[in-house]
């Protein structure tokens, strides 16, 4: 059976030493109820749940999968019990407002809790994760009556939530959705249409499912300006809050997928289902993007969790597997061979994974802290700066973390050799489960276009320049004995500053340029961000003594010498322009003659 030990020491180091969590909590009156001891206790309890409850049903859940029969989805054995335990423990509402039954914990803490569940059972976590996202959208845009009706039961786990956007013909371009919302005299709407790829669209974990559905009224403006958001419960809710009659919202089937097989991905049919408008007509996309942005950071955590899981198992296998001898001489004379951990290429794969894991974890906490500032700070200027940072870095958190994680998981599978390709060791499931993280909630290519387009060109590089200024201010303050990471980070910041200006000028002259450059630009920004995280971790580690902290400095040096140089390659590709990409005719791609 695969192993997993929650990286609690690293999590506590990042929270307490790198981001000074307790000081941050105490400086925000809305977080004064949280201290370091509380945060650490939460992480320790989640580690137990992940290791003892969700990990044991990960492989069996994959093998059994969610099933569909007679219009009803059934989750694999053990999922109902695990979900009840998760809900009873208050985990669904960990970061939710206390007003609605949540615990009011900061995002910089909840990202670490989510990482552990993504590491041990991503299919399981997707069910409550969609509920949390739906709750966030409702809390931001729903009426007081709607909040009182739905939020307490969503956060208690009695009910769950979904996000219904995609249609067979409308994925990234939501402006062309066909789902209709016909007004009724009583203020409700009849929702008619089909949605696809709906995670948790049906299941047996909760007594009701609250679908958040994008639809258009008959007189709606064309395109995305005409999208409205509706609450469409699986079962209608009575005046006293109890579950009533069945609504005309039902799954038509579930998808047969490459991975996350225990997570029900449904085709949802709405046949005149009763719906309730959230906010105002034609303003639904803004509400849905509250949920989407939350999910995008969560997908980054899915990548991190899988990569950590894969790394731990590959490192253990490399330690145990004896094969060949070290090129520098026998290391284990009492054995017939040395462990494969003595080989440089095996170490390269493991160190790449570990470096990216630790930087990803720090980056997730950093973005989480920025989200906390936007939610809890009372300083308007500080909130504005944090909002800019979140806007800029959300696509990086989603795309770069999942891209690096997938590479790490493939490398971990390679460490196992042929054993990585068979079911026994868990690596092939890890690969299959993780692949979707680069695809859903906006493909990584779309995230890259968002970064270079909306978050860079549209604001004339202001968001990026603010971020670079923050990085430079931090790096310039580092002591001389950290010059290796200081200089590397400052050089990376200068390279990103320069290529950003290049992009602004090139995009003004050539409309095709930004699309062709987007993925390489995002990866370059991701590398700068990881260098910034290693600079912050190195500063914290330098102030401490012990092997744990010395290893932090050694890993930072590895990152500088073996991973960060890719930044220059990415920038070279950005500057190559779009002509070599766009010069091929459309016929070229299908004409094999």
Question: What is each PLM-predicted segment?
Answer:
Residues 132-134, 143-146, 150, 443, ...:
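A structural-propensity feature for long, helix-poor, extended segments
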Residues 188, 192-246:
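A short core secondary-structure module
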Residues 100, 112, 458, 473-593:
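C-terminal amphipathic alpha-helical interaction region
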Residues 79, 130-131, 142-183, 368-387, ...:
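Internal maturation/activation junctions in enzymes
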Residues 197-199, 236-252, 257, 264-295, ...:
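A glycine-rich, basic-preceded beta-loop-alpha segment at the flavin cofactor/substrate interface
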Residues 31-33, 63-75, 287-298, 312-353, ...:
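Glycine-rich cofactor-pocket loops
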Residues 1-125, 145, 149, 372, ...:
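Amphipathic, small/basic residue-rich leader segments at the start of a protein or domain
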Residues 2-5, 19, 90, 183, ...:
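Alpha-helix capping/hinge segments and adjacent helical runs
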């Amino acid at each position: 059976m695969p192993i997993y030990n929650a990286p609690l020491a690293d999590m506590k180091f990042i929270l307490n030493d790198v981001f000074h969590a307790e000081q941050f909590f105490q400086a925000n009156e809305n977080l004064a109820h949280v201290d370091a001891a509380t945060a650490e206790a939460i992480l320790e309890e989640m580690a137990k749940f992940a290791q003892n409850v969700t990990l044991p049903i990960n492989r069996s859940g994959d093998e059994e999968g969610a099933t569909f029969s007679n219009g009803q989805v059934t989750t694999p054995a053990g999922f109902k019990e695990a979900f009840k335990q998760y809900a009873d423990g208050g985990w669904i509402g960990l970061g939710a407002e206390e007003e609605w039954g949540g615990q009011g914990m900061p995002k910089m803490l909840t990202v670490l809790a989510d990482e552990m569940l993504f590491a041990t059972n991503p299919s399981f976590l997707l069910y409550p994760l969609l509920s949390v996202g739906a709750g966030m959208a409702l809390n931001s845009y729903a009426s007081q009556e709607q909040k009182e009706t739905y939020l307490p039961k969503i956060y208690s786990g009695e009910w769950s939530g979904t996000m219904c956007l995609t249609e067979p013909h409308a994925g990234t371009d939501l402006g062309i959705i066909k789902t209709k919302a016909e007004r009724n005299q009583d203020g409700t709407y009849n929702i008619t249409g089909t949605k696809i790829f709906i995670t948790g669209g049906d299941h047996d974990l909760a007594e009701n499912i609250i679908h958040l559905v994008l639809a258009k009224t008959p007189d709606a403006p064309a395109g995305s300006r005409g999208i409205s958001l509706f609450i469409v419960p699986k079962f209608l809710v009575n005046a006293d809050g109890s579950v009533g009659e069945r609504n005309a919202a039902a799954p038509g089937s579930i998808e047969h997928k490459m991975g996350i097989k225990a997570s029900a991905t449904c085709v949802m049919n709405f046949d005149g289902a009763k719906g309730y408008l959230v906010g105002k007509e034609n303003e639904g996309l803004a509400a849905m993007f509250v949920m989407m942005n939350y999910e995008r950071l969560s997908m980054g955590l899915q990548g991190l969790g899988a990569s950590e899981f894969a790394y731990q198992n590959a490192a253990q296998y490399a330690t145990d597997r004896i094969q060949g001898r070290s090129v520098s001489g026998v290391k284990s004379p009492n054995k017939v061979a040395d462990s494969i951990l003595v080989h440089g290429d095996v170490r390269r794969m493991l160190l790449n994974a570990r470096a990216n894991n630790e930087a990803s974890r720090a980056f997730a906490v950093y973005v989480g802290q920025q989200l906390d500032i936007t939610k809890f700070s009372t300083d308007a200027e500080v909130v504005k700066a944090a909002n800019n940072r979140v806007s800029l870095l959300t696509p990086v958190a989603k795309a770069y973390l999942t891209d690096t994680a997938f590479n790490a998981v493939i490398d971990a599978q390679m460490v196992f050799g042929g054993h990585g390709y068979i079911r026994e060791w868990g690596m092939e499931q890890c690969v299959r489960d993780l692949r979707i993280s680069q695809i859903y909630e906006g493909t990584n290519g779309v995230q890259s276009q968002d970064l270079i387009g909306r978050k860079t060109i549209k604001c004339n590089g202001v968001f990026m320049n603010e971020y670079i200024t923050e990085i430079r201010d931090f790096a310039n303050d580092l002591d001389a004995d950290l010059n290796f990471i200081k200089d590397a980070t400052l050089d990376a910041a200068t390279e990103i500053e320069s290529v950003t200006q290049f992009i602004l000028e090139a995009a003004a002259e050539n409309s095709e340029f930004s699309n062709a450059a987007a993925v390489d630009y995002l990866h370059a920004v991701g590398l700068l961000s990881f260098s910034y995280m290693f600079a912050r971790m190195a500063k914290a580690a330098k102030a401490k003594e012990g092997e744990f902290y010395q290893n932090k400095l050694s890993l930072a040096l590895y990152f500088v010498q073996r991973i960060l140089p890719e930044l220059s390659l990415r920038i070279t590709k950005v500057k190559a322009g779009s002509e070599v990409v766009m010069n091929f005719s459309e016929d070229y791609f299908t004409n094999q003659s």
